[in-house]
Amino acid sequence: CIVCGNKKLNKFLDLGKTALANNFLEPEDLNLIDEEFYPLRVAYCNNCFHVQLIDHVNPKKMFDNYLYISSASKTLTDHLYSLAKVITRKIPFKRNDLVIDIGSNDGTLLSSFKKIDKKLEVLGVEPAKNLVKFANKKNINCVNSYLDIEVAKGIVSNYGNARLVTSTNSFPHIQNLHNFMNSVNELLSDDGVFVLEAHYLVDLFEQKAFDTVYHCLLYTSDAADDRMR
């Protein structure tokens, strides 16, 4: 189990071997015999009851060049702007407070924060080089890396601690959850806030949204609350 380390996972869904999500082939790559496929099996832990994938793809294969762009979806763009508005109402930001978005994609969420509160400083952490270029065009500064404790220490050294750290739908892709949370803790100031957004398992079942089952972790509210403590 990614969360508690328990060795016993109970499989309840097997979607067979599946190509990488958001991985579009060029015309010269259409020899499907050479396309990579991976098992897509879903299980729950009989200790902490977290639902998760049994098999994990090397993150570099999925995210070093990522083709899903947040701003391409008006629905998502509007949602992220609304999220930024809710957060800025709840947190009494001061001038030059730092907001860090983990898995910042093309900077859509951070751009929303800048529109709503121009006194904020923002920083993205994004492993996909192509997405960092899009963010930079929006004047969003990014660290082109996966987050770990050493990267977090480097960010604090260069930019200071964050009043807010966000992770919207990058959080369910995290394979080393404990390292990630330690890194977030390193980034946060003493009064810092961490906001995460993840797929809700109950909605997935009710909507039969099997097409979203490629995230490492799928959360219920109770399981998320328990593990964040």
Regions found by a protein language model. Give the residues of each.
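N-terminal juxtadomain amphipathic helix
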Residues: I2-T75
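Conserved SAM-binding strand-loop segment of SAM-dependent methyltransferases
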Residues: N139-V151
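A short glycine-rich, Lys/Arg-flanked "PGG" loop and its adjoining helix->strand segment in the class I
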Residues: N179-V193
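Short, glycine-/aromatic-enriched active-site segment of Class I SAM-dependent methyltransferases
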Residues: L196-L218
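Single conserved hydrophobic/aromatic residue that forms the stacking wall/gate
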Residues: Y219, A223-R229
